[in-house]
């Protein structure tokens, strides 16, 4: 009987802790540093190749694109 009461009280305490923590963290950002890092990796200036329609006089075009010299060298479909 005592063991059952102790287990019930322990489960209730853990549940209350979970609810308090969830309420406190509701407006907080989760894994903010990971999102910032991913944003920096996908930033337009950090990519190694130039995408469709981008200038290609300082970078190579991405795979499947070719640098065409119009007025300004631009990556176009091959």
Curated annotation (Swiss-Prot):
CC annotations in GO: extracellular region
Modified residues (Pyrrolidone carboxylic acid): 48
Keywords annotated in UniProt: Disulfide bond, Knottin, Neurotoxin, Pyrrolidone carboxylic acid, Secreted, Signal, Toxin
UniProt subcellular location: Secreted
Propeptide segments, given as residue ranges: 23-47
Tissue expression as described in the entry: Expressed by the venom duct.
Classification via Pfam families: Conotoxin
Signal peptide: 1-22
InterPro entries: Conotoxin (IPR004214)
Covalent S-S links between cysteines: 49-62, 56-67, 61-75
One Gene Ontology MF term: toxin activity
Record family assignment: Belongs to the conotoxin O1 superfamily.
Domain notes: The presence of a 'disulfide through disulfide knot' structurally defines this protein as a knottin. The cysteine framework is VI/VII (C-C-CC-C-C).
Name used for this protein in its record: Conotoxin ArMKLT2-0313
Phylogenetic lineage: Eukaryota, Metazoa, Spiralia, Lophotrochozoa, Mollusca
């Amino acid at each position: 009987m005592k063991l059952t009461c102790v287990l019930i009280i322990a489960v209730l305490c853990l549940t209350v802790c979970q609810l308090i923590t969830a309420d406190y963290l509701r407006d907080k950002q989760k894994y903010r540093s990971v999102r910032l890092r991913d944003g920096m990796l996908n930033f337009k200036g950090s990519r190694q190749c130039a995408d469709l329609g981008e200038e290609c006089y300082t970078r190579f075009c991405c795979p499947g694109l070719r640098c065409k010299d119009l007025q300004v060298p631009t990556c176009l479909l091959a």
